[in-house]
Amino acid sequence: RAAYVPLIHKSGTGDLLGFNEPDERKQSNMSVEQAISLWPKLESTGLRLGSPATSRHETLGKASWLGRFMTQAEAKGLRVDFVAVHYYSTDKDVAAFREFLEAVHKQYKRPVWVTEWALADWDDPSRFSAAEQAEFARVGTEMMDDLPFVERHAWFAAYEGGDGWHLNSGIFDSRGNLTPVGKVF
């Protein structure tokens, strides 16, 4: 029999992230209406709340998953303190990444957290080398550090193969040594 394990502890954090990729079947997989109905429970924690982090194609525009969520949240007076986003680049274009972040900030008028980012080709996971990942990490970090509305960012993933995709994006290898990406951070 499974035991109850609370996901929120008194850890000293003042922030709580919303649902992870609710627009994706293999992630939290929920409708906007389901997320809106659960949101008051997150608000009741008293923590600063990050929006649900949608996949990139469902982040921008009024008709996107996040656009509909934010419209309904605002109409109901629900609190969303910052917008959490994911960004996976297939072309190493940091200028496009910056434009995406600026568009998110312009549309939602809130601070932005990039809670997952890396180079990724889901059809060919090993397409990008560790050196390419490291360079994207370096240039992307510099770019985000220059954007005053980006409060946090978290690279994907912590250790190579830990994501199940083998994107050459891990910060640590299987022995716990820093990879080229890890040395950037």
Language-model regions, residue ranges each:
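Short acidic, gly/pro-rich beta-turn/loop elements at beta-sheet edges
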Residues: 59-61, 93, 163
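Non-transmembrane alpha-helical segments in soluble domains
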Residues: 39-43, 70, 105, 141, ...
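Active-site clefts of carbohydrate-active enzymes
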Residues: 24, 50-56, 107-137, 155-172
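Aromatic/hydrophobic pocket-lining residues that form the small-molecule binding cavity
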Residues: 31, 35, 97, 133, ...
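Substrate-binding cleft of extracellular glycoside hydrolase catalytic domains
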Residues: 1-81, 88, 125-131
